[in-house]
Amino acid sequence: DGTITFDDEDGREWTLPVTGGNVKLQWKPDFGARWAALDVDFEMYGKDHSTNTPIYDGICEALGGRAPEHFIYELFLDESGQKISKSKGNGLTIDEWLSYAATESLGYFMYQKPKTAKRMHFDVIPKAVDEYHQQLRAFPTQTIDQQLANPVWHLHRGQPPVSDMVVPFAMLLNLASVAGAKDKSGLWGFIKRYAPDASPEANPQMDQAAGFALRYFNDFVAPTRVFRLPSDQERAAMEDLAGRLKIWDGGLDAEALQTMVFAVGTEHGFEPLRGWFTGLYEVLLGASQGPRFGGFIALYGVDETVALIGRALAGELV
């Protein structure tokens, strides 16, 4: 009848309705009682509760309910692989994530491999944003089975939107690194040259990402950048690259530019070739890794990249 009867510490018997905030069960029986009261048929919870599952189920069944189906997910870890703890303050809150990326990127991150412990820290945000939009772009070309396995189908209840991200989030961070933009309108000058049909009005996801990218860059990338001077081999290769760019007549074709950058590294004897690209990132962007450099040139601009190389070789970035 929705009441609970108990004896208090003085031996008096009380009967109270369980509604209206009169009672609160201890946390272990609360799970099972809630399942029975609300006819819960599916419950997911962290693995720290998994050892108590038989207790929860037993309480639910004792109250006349049917234990729900369970899904137990792994816990999130911090950057160093330690369990996230409120007392340590080593976690990344939802509000913090949403200060640097759209809600859907967080949903995408959480969807991935729920039974695997995932490191959740600020550095994973750009990757989550770009992978989410990759899945959006792939969705229209997929078979029904592939679409049902695509996270965006579940995130958007079968009706995922069309991605209007003409520039990846990671590339926006690199653009912010060299563009000196104070607000997203400064980034849009480069974006529109790269994708003339794009605009803040026609590409709201892109516009939002541009604002997020500037904030993320200023808070996390800029304080950690470390520029260095090039080695003799790198200097010769960068001078060659700048010379080829000065006479470049291939437009803003990212693939053609990437092929040319690749050829410069090969001709200057970089082995493995990864060392050539690492040198470009460290000398020009102050980072140990970065985008496909041809795509970066196409977005930032050929003349602007020549000028950037000149400043780096002159030691002005160090």
Role assignments for model-derived ranges:
Residues D1-K88, I94:
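Active-site cores that bind ATP or allylic diphosphates and position pyrophosphate for catalysis
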Residues W35-M44, K88-L92, A242-K246, T259-T266, ...:
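Glycine- and acidic
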Residues H70-Y73, Y108-Q112, H121-V124, W188, ...:
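Short coil/turn segments at secondary-structure boundaries
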Residues Y56, A102, L280:
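Residue-level signal for inorganic ion chemistry
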